[in-house]
Amino acid sequence: NRIVKRIELKVPVSRVWQALTDYREFVEWFRAKIDGPFVVGEVSTGHITYPGYEHLKWEAVVQKMEHERLFSFTWPHHSDDPNADNLNAPSTLVEFRLEPIKGGTLLTVTESGFENLPVDDRDKAFRDNEGGWTEQMTNIETYLANG
């Protein structure tokens, strides 16, 4: 009940960390507009700008920021209703783990907690997010290669 994606990036851990945790960079590759910096224990808000998903809010609670090692947040299972109170909805945990490797960084993204979602929504949420993380791994790789 977890999604795990790994990618070898040809940049140092410090550069990947910056792309993940500086919200001004995160929005470029993730394709979202976020209202302010990531702060542990605080809610990060905004909206998705990825084509076809612009109607979705960006809402996450930052869980951990272990310098150049781990960045994690929980995000709620979104309703298609743009006015829904998503922050009180069941959520999953997203973890970005960074590991130095020869020639760059191994980035591992894990999303877990799908068992917390309503039974009727689990399979679709898992499939949608599995495909989404495949796309996001390509996005961050392209972003870092070009900048």
PLM-predicted stretches and their roles:
Residues 16-17, 26, 44-46, 62, ...:
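Hydrophobic pocket/interface hotspot
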